[in-house]
Amino acid sequence: MSMDISDFYQTFFDEADELLADMEQHLLVLQPEAPDAEQLNAIFRAAHSIKGGAGTFGFSVLQETTHLMENLLDEARRGEMQLNTDIINLFLETKDIMQEQLDAYKQSQEPDAASFDYICQALRQLALEAKGETPSAVTRLSVVAKSEPQDEQSRSQSPRRIILSRLKAGEVDLLEEELGHLTTLTDVVKGADSLSAILPGDIAEDDITAVLCFVIEADQITFETVEVSPKISTPPVLKLAAEQAPTGRVEREKTTRSNESTSIRVAVEKVDQLINLVGELVITQSMLAQRSSELDPVNHGDLITSMGQLQRNARDLQESVMSIRMMPMEYVFSRYPRLVRDLAGKLGKQVELTLVGSSTELDKSLIERIIDPLTHLVRNSLDHGIELPEKRLAAGKNSVGNLILSAEHQGGNICIEVTDDGAGLNRERILAKAASQGLTVSENMSDDEVAMLIFAPGFSTAEQVTDVSGRGVGMDVVKRNIQKMGGHVEIQSKQGTGTTIRILLPLTLAILDGMSVRVADEVFILPLNAVMESLQPREADLHPLAGGERVLEVRGEYLPIVELWKVFNVAGAKTEATQGIVVILQSGGRRYALLVDQLIGQHQVVVKNLESNYRKVPGISAATILGDGSVALIVDVSALQAINREQRMANTAA
């Protein structure tokens, strides 16, 4: 049975992505004056592994690019080339082009020829300069790059026998073919599950292992030195050779493999399917629990006890499955050291980036959606927040600005903060700009309320538009995207001191801790993280305002009242506030009182997408299935107050 090596493409793509990310992280912290040997070795190993895999799968453009970079890295780690900032920048640029080449191969396309020619010429030029050769040698760069240095070729090594054992059906012929692509094989011996051949001494064992490990494991590969003599001896029996393999190599491989973390790659679609099935199981368990609660405990005690155990097991299973989708914030944070470094250099600023809480976990779907909003906030802090070095010195600050990205869990939420010690927000300029755009403003507004004006559509106080920011099309999009994820944005700023933008998000979109409330015969779910408290209002605490609006006084704070029955036109609800219950909700830094008929209870619900199953409903974010099989709507807390205001204004105009 033949085996198609293209079956292993995805494995190479996944590993190459990880290796390129590791390479970038090491390059960003590499000190050119005194480079750390371990970091240089790690960068070299990453390039070496990518080159080997690219050669195996015939990705010649990526292989050649990586080969040129690998040679330079080898010279640097041997101390034959002195690093500087320009060289590290070139390595980072090479990494970017390698990523573009890899992405092209993923799409079954050929990489861009112009960028390939450009980066190859740049790397070859650097190689010439490192050797002290003149730029006039460019005419023969291609020959120089593709041929190994003469002194290295002269270092002949003894031929070696490679022994591959425990092979699967089809792998014997496949691996023989792949080895033939790397070098010339002699004295080939093939068994049912083994392969043996003599290799010339001009190819490194690491190169061979790097290629073969995309198909088999490292402990299936053994090398033996073959003594050079006029007469080639008969190859040893494969099984015996495997048993008599050099002890040191076997022990080293076992040690290496024992230190590796055991993990498998699973498609996200399979995880999502598993989560959906567990969600259905939880709903079924909830239905059974509701039915069993109606039974007589005396006659059905064992059944009720078993139902309690089932509930605990279902909850544990749900939490375990949900944890599979959780990813560390490091996945997001890892892209910002490069962004800050490049953008700060472009703007002529000095910035030190600090990352806090990289191990904090968040649902994969939210991780992917938070990248763009967070990137905009980081760019905004660099462009508008942190000042130029001379301005910072004039203000009595350190010339190096500080930018902090942090993440931490707060209950069932994650709090992500972007903090800078820059100029802060200019209250007067924001108010003037807001007034000129027709926004409702007042001098009595608090600093936090003024700061939230920057999230208005089209709002920008930038004196000039740059390719970094300044068009006013970003901050409102940031806010809307965060709200779509079930979160909200807060901002705190002090002029001359700095700004902190805080993003609060639920840990997952699949499970929700909610408070169920009743309005007439309808049941609604309020996200528990938005619920502050609940109370029954007194007539003395209710105060009318112009336009039919009422506010509720709670410990000296006046909160607008939103009547849920009015928002969704629910018939038969309690219309008098003193007869119902108000739930104090907080969203987007603002609080209001939501009038409902009755509180039912607090529980976890499985979130079902309403838009894909029905249509988008203003004021409703999703739906869920209750224990009795009925459907309850999950309220969009951030949208309710605005909908209530629009309805009241429409009624007044009519």
Curated annotation (Swiss-Prot):
Function: Involved in the transmission of sensory signals from the chemoreceptors to the flagellar motors. CheA is autophosphorylated; it can transfer its phosphate group to either CheB or CheY.
UniProt entry tagged with the keyword GTP-binding: no
One Pfam family this sequence matches: HATPase_c
Alphabetic keyword roster: ATP-binding, Chemotaxis, Cytoplasm, Kinase, Nucleotide-binding, Phosphoprotein, Transferase, Two-component regulatory system
Subunit structure, interactors included: An in vitro complex of CheW/CheA(L)/CheA(S) in a 1:1:1 ratio increases the autophosphorylation of CheA and is required for the binding of CheY, the phosphorylation substrate. This complex accounts for 10% of the total number of molecules.
GO BP: aerotaxis; bacterial-type flagellum-dependent swimming motility; chemotaxis; establishment of localization in cell; negative regulation of protein modification process; phosphorelay signal transduction system; positive regulation of post-translational protein modification; regulation of bacterial-type flagellum-dependent cell motility
Xref: PROSITE patterns: CHEW, HIS_KIN, HPT
Transmembrane segments: none
Major location category of this protein: cytoplasm
The keyword Protease is annotated on this UniProt entry: no
GO molecular function terms noted in the UniProt entry: ATP binding; phosphorelay sensor kinase activity; protein histidine kinase activity
Domain HPt: start-end pairs: 1-105
Name assigned to this protein: Chemotaxis protein CheA
E.C. code: 2.7.13.3
Occurrences of domain CheW-like (ranges): 511-646
Histidine kinase domain segment(s): 257-509
UniProt remark on domains: May have three functional domains: one for interaction with CheB and CheY, a second for regulating phosphorylation and controlling the stability of the protein, and a third for receiving input signals regulating CheA activity.
Catalytic activity reported: ATP + protein L-histidine = ADP + protein N-phospho-L-histidine
GO CC annotations, alphabetized: cytoplasm; cytosol; methyl accepting chemotaxis protein complex; plasma membrane
Modified residues (Phosphohistidine): 48
Compartments (UniProt record): Cytoplasm
